């Protein structure tokens, strides 16, 4: 396996955490997870995540079992019904974020690249993602960004991957293939050439076999 320079440079940090934790974070980063760089603390990484109101138990699960071991974390409701301008409104989203930590700084260097045109960092698929991916990653990826898809008699799972390029989606398909999961690309946006990954219906049982023991209660989607 060839390693890129960035991955080699952060291997000591990566190797300092259990594989199960790394695999979980990978699944989250393929889904709704985000890492930003603090403007106050010398560009150190902060992990954050926003999900709908129905996913609060899942966010607490991630916080309690994964992210709180690195730093203190804080939850926010949106809209903030304690504010006068939001009085009477229903909460639609929950957001949590960590404080800065060297692990998140290191992972940011893998998961993001600077885009001059957009003048910001954009999320990418890391070159060595195969070293950080397992069935645990798949389970959390599905819980983050999986969708039960039923068209006629065809029942399967869609993974929301339109934030990644077609080439990156193909890389992600190769990860699924290593788990003996077949998939196809489903066009989402022809103009911008964006795709979702559709798990082949013949592989649905394989997916369930791999992830059901990992998915938390109330988030087994099929």
Map each language-model feature to its residues:
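Internal intein/HINT superfamily modules and their associated LAGLIDADG
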Residues: 1-222
